[in-house]
């Protein structure tokens, strides 16, 4: 019996390329925050969600799986990247099991929800596993500018795709699992229709402060100010995913606290971290200002690179600082902001400090998923060969101008 099951599994895996080729021909269908809310309202229909997801999830999976295969062979050959590929193939095959199932069958709907939970759990370690694959590549082959450029382009799209897939899965499983989260009874899935921005700021600060106090025995205070240009008498609320906002803020607080404490280690007091939350007609902006010494301009873009980290990668059991890691915190935080058409930018003054600004859409109708699509434009990006720059490169040695003197 065991050999028969193995035979069936191998037959399924053999069919994976056919499914990838088919579903990658379709473009993903981005949803707005308002559509997510409508989808999960009191009259939400599990059958409708099932019918949508069994088509949409394969499209999103297949699109990004086509791009994985465009990575340099040296990256694809690393054990960690191969493991991630196997997870994606298995998840696609899991959903294919429901392609012809009857949505009127309650058992089918229950099995589909269980399958989504399995897929979500399978992909829990995708980020650190892919990060390990990049490290394996760097350790073996060193730095290659062309490959680095392609890896940066791919990982931005890959992780953004992952965020979107988990969003779809979380909405379905949280809404249709038959229970309500007692801690957040008014949430629609993972979305808070009335999210208090300052409350999320405080939660993220408290957790980062806990880590900072534990490691450094000190931490900067927090000052929060709100400016509501649409209604000056009301606190600022928005429709958003609190866990996404928390992720961004927690990462920024960790960086700000680490920089502040380390740059003022000889001082008796630490300058506070200041938060400004501003709501306008189009944007909701959150600015975090620290006095952590800042970063040189030439290093700003590096902070968003997956190939660069300001701290050594922590090894299990070594007691490394909890405020550092793979160096993926900022790049992925920016992707969370971009996912619903926002952004995360850094403005630094070396010798003084850094302002980090999170830009989000104020209206739920404007908060639309930003999704990668596999097409000729994406394919061409991976085929691009880095050419010589069209700007002069300053010499590292000062030029001897005496050779140009007229005798």
UniProtKB/Swiss-Prot annotation:
Segments passing through the bilayer: none
Residues carrying Phosphotyrosine: 215-216
PROSITE patterns tied to this protein: HIS_KIN (PS50109)
Subcellular location: Mitochondrion matrix
Residue positions, PTM N6-succinyllysine: 376
Regulation affecting activity: Activity increases in response to increased acetyl-CoA and NADH levels and upon binding to the pyruvate dehydrogenase subunit DLAT. Inhibited by ADP and pyruvate; these compounds interfere with DLAT binding and thereby inhibit kinase activity. Inhibited by dichloroacetate. Inhibited by AZD7545; this compound interferes with DLAT binding and thereby inhibits kinase activity. Reactive oxygen species cause the formation of disulfide bonds, and thereby inhibit the enzyme.
GO cellular component: mitochondrial matrix; mitochondrion; pyruvate dehydrogenase complex
Main localization category: mitochondrion
GO MF entries: ATP binding; identical protein binding; protein homodimerization activity; protein serine/threonine kinase activity; protein-containing complex binding; pyruvate dehydrogenase (acetyl-transferring) kinase activity
Annotated ranges, domain Histidine kinase: 135-364
One of the GO biological process terms: regulation of pH
UniProt-annotated binding residues for ATP: 251-258, 290, 309-310, 325-330
Keyword Nucleotide-binding (UniProt): yes
Top-level taxon in the UniProt lineage: Eukaryota
Keywords from the UniProt entry: ATP-binding, Kinase, Mitochondrion, Nucleotide-binding, Phosphoprotein, Transferase, Transit peptide
Expressing tissues: Detected in heart (at protein level). Highest level of expression in heart and skeletal muscle and the lowest in spleen and lung. Liver, kidney, brain and testis levels are intermediate.
E.C. no: 2.7.11.2
Keyword Protease: no
Reaction catalysis annotation: L-seryl-[pyruvate dehydrogenase E1 alpha subunit] + ATP = O-phospho-L-seryl-[pyruvate dehydrogenase E1 alpha subunit] + ADP + H(+)
Enzyme class, UniProt record, top EC level: transferase
PANTHER family assigned to the protein according to its UniProt record, in alphabetical order: [PYRUVATE DEHYDROGENASE (ACETYL-TRANSFERRING)] KINASE ISOZYME 2, MITOCHONDRIAL, PYRUVATE DEHYDROGENASE KINASE
Subunit structure as annotated in this protein's UniProt entry: Homodimer, and heterodimer with PDK1. Interacts with the pyruvate dehydrogenase complex subunit DLAT, and is part of the multimeric pyruvate dehydrogenase complex that contains multiple copies of pyruvate dehydrogenase (E1), dihydrolipoamide acetyltransferase (DLAT, E2) and lipoamide dehydrogenase (DLD, E3).
Purpose: Kinase that plays a key role in the regulation of glucose and fatty acid metabolism and homeostasis via phosphorylation of the pyruvate dehydrogenase subunits PDHA1 and PDHA2. This inhibits pyruvate dehydrogenase activity, and thereby regulates metabolite flux through the tricarboxylic acid cycle, down-regulates aerobic respiration and inhibits the formation of acetyl-coenzyme A from pyruvate. Inhibition of pyruvate dehydrogenase decreases glucose utilization and increases fat metabolism. Mediates cellular responses to insulin.
UniProt family annotation: Belongs to the PDK/BCKDK protein kinase family.
Name of the protein in question: [Pyruvate dehydrogenase (acetyl-transferring)] kinase isozyme 2, mitochondrial
Originating organism: Rattus norvegicus (Rat)
Name of the gene this protein is made from: Pdk2
């Amino acid at each position: 019996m065991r050999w028969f099951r193995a035979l069936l599994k191998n037959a399924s895996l053999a069919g994976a390329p056919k499914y990838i080729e088919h579903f990658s021909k379709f473009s993903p269908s981005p949803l707005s925050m308002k559509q997510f809310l409508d989808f999960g309202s009191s009259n939400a229909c599990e059958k409708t969600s099932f019918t949508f997801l069994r088509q949409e999830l394969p499209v999103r999976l297949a699109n990004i799986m086509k791009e994985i295969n465009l990575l340099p062979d040296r990256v694809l050959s690393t054990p960690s990247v191969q493991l991630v590929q196997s997870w994606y193939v298995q998840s696609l095959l899991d959903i294919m099991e429901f392609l012809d199932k009857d949505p009127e069958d309650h058992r089918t709907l229950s099995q589909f929800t269980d399958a989504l939970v399995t897929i979500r759990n399978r992909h829990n370690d995708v980020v650190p596993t892919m990060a390990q694959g990049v490290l394996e590549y760097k350790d073996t082959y060193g730095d290659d500018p062309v490959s680095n450029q392609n890896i940066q382009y791919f990982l931005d799209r890959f992780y953004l795709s992952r965020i979107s897939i988990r969003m779809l899965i979380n909405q379905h499983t949280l809404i249709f699992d038959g229970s309500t989260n007692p801690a957040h009874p008014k949430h629609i899935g993972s979305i808070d229709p009335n999210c208090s921005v300052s409350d999320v700021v405080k939660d993220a600060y408290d957790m980062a402060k806990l880590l900072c106090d534990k490691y450094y025995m000190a931490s900067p205070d927090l000052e929060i100010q709100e400016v509501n240009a649409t209604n000056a008498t009301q606190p600022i609320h928005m429709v958003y995913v609190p866990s996404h906002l928390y992720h961004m803020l927690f990462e920024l607080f960790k960086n700000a606290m680490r920089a502040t404490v380390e740059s003022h280690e000889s001082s008796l007091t630490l300058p506070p971290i200041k938060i400004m939350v501003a709501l306008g007609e189009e944007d909701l902006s959150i600015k975090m200002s620290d006095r952590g010494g800042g970063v040189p301009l030439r290093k700003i873009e590096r902070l968003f690179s997956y190939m660069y980290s300001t701290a050594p990668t922590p090894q299990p059991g070594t007691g490394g600082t909890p405020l550092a890691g793979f160096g993926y915190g900022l790049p992925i935080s920016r992707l969370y902001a971009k996912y619903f058409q926002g952004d995360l930018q850094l403005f630094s003054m070396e010798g003084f400090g850094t302002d980090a600004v999170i830009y989000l859409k104020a209206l739920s109708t404007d908060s639309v998923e930003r999704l990668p699509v596999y097409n000729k434009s994406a394919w061409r990006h991976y085929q691009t060969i880095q050419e010589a720059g069209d700007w002069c490169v300053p010499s590292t040695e000062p030029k001897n101008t005496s050779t140009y003197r007229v005798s």
